[in-house]
């Protein structure tokens, strides 16, 4: 399992958003074999696995449109692998969120 610092400004912005709301960043750009978790954050008993999608301009649709059923399946599988390697977190309340980073702001959607 590898975790890197934020290599992309959208992920750094999303991490800052969570930190300002009292979350602790447990990992960013975490690679687990063929799976990646953009952000893993925790606040109290809530553990959130985040997929971050950014958009810099007005073309090419909404960032949320970039997350399809296959991407959600891979996110779920990555979370399963991460939890298996971090059994102390198995009792936490887990959720998945897609974070859409746009020029005017940021939107979190629970999936």
Q: Regions from the language model: what does each represent?
A:
Residues 32-35:
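Short acidic/glycine-enriched loop/turn segments that link adjacent beta-strands
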Residues 25-27, 49, 96:
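Hydrophobic residues on conserved beta-strands that form the core of alpha/beta folds
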Residues 85-111:
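Domain-level recognition of nuclease-like catalytic cores that cleave nucleotide substrates
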Residues 37-63, 67, 75:
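Conserved catalytic cores of phosphodiester-cleaving nucleases, focusing on short active-site segments
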Residues 1-30:
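Acidic-basic catalytic patches of nuclease active cores, encompassing PD-(D/E)XK
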Residues 66-87:
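Short, charged, amphipathic alpha-helix that recurs within catalytic cores of restriction-modification
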């Amino acid at each position: 399992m590898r975790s890197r610092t934020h290599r992309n400004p959208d992920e750094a912005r999303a991490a800052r958003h969570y930190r300002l709301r009292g979350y602790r960043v447990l990992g960013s750009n975490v690679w687990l074999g063929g799976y990646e978790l953009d952000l893993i954050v925790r606040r109290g008993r809530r553990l959130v696995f985040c997929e971050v999608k950014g958009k810099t301009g007005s073309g090419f649709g909404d960032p949320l449109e970039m997350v399809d059923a296959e991407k959600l399946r891979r996110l779920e599988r990555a979370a399963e692998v991460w939890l298996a390697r971090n059994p102390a977190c198995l009792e936490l309340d887990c959720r998945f969120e897609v974070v859409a980073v746009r020029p005017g702001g940021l939107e979190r959607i629970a999936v």
